[in-house]
């Protein structure tokens, strides 16, 4: 299914409906080092290189996505400015201390958030930041049906499930409340510096019942977390 996500939601955008004024949350780029968790087609990596990043690493579990990203970033890879890893985010990488780890709708797929957060924490310099976006937890339990917003599950009921609407391919997901994400980040040692729930700027439906603009205009679609590794 990697082709479904080719060039979707990459820097400076953080979610499916666009982010607007929140595009600059990545902070200074020139001369900095970055790691993208779940690099997809590699467009965010290319964006950072073009903006003067010293080095950009990327990790993704998909060989197809790695091929996409490697082709797009062929020149900076040969110059040693980009290095890609085909591994699960739960596996520890050997990396120099880096300035910023980020993930655009990638980190939320982890099957072991404690292990993944421990990895991310270890990669960062003291004072480094982890910035990531994911579906807002409230958005996840509401769908649109016949023009009305319908609560399709309990916000309080955290659950694992297999989604079967991805062209017939079963996909594992786990729904977590915002409070749970906060505790996971805190317990990993991070300080949550900011939390954003931006309004949409792209005014069109992306799916028939889930990513609809009427829903996104009333309920925040994306959540963006800015987390700091204390000095």
Region locations from a protein language model:
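Short alpha-helix
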Residues: 172-195
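A short SAM/SAH-binding and catalytic strip from SAM-dependent methyltransferases
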Residues: 100-113
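A short acidic, Gly/Pro-enriched loop at the edge of an enzyme's catalytic core
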Residues: 93-101
């Amino acid at each position: 299914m990697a082709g479904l996500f080719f060039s979707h939601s990459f820097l400076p955008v953080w979610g499916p409906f666009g982010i607007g004024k929140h595009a600059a949350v990545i902070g200074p780029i020139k001369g900095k080092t970055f790691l993208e968790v779940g690099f997809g087609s590699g467009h965010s990596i290319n964006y950072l290189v073009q903006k003067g990043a010293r080095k950009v690493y990327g990790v993704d579990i998909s060989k197809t996505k790695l091929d996409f990203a490697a082709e797009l970033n062929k020149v900076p890879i040969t110059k040693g400015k980009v290095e890609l890893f085909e591994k699960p985010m739960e596996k520890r990488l050997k990396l120099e201390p880096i300035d910023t780890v980020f993930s655009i709708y990638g980190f939320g797929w982890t099957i072991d958030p404690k292990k993944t957060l421990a990895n991310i924490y270890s990669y960062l310099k003291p004072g480094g930041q982890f910035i990531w976006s994911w579906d807002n937890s409230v958005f996840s339990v509401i769908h649109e049906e016949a023009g009305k917003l319908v609560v399709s599950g309990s916000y309080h009921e955290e659950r694992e499930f297999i989604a079967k609407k991805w062209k017939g391919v079963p996909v594992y997901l786990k729904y977590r409340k915002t409070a749970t994400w906060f505790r996971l980040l805190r317990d990993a040692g991070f300080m949550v510096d900011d939390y954003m729930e931006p309004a949409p700027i792209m005014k069109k439906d992306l799916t028939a019942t889930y990513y609809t603009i009427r829903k996104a205009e009333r309920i925040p679609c994306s959540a963006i977390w800015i987390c700091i590794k204390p000095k």
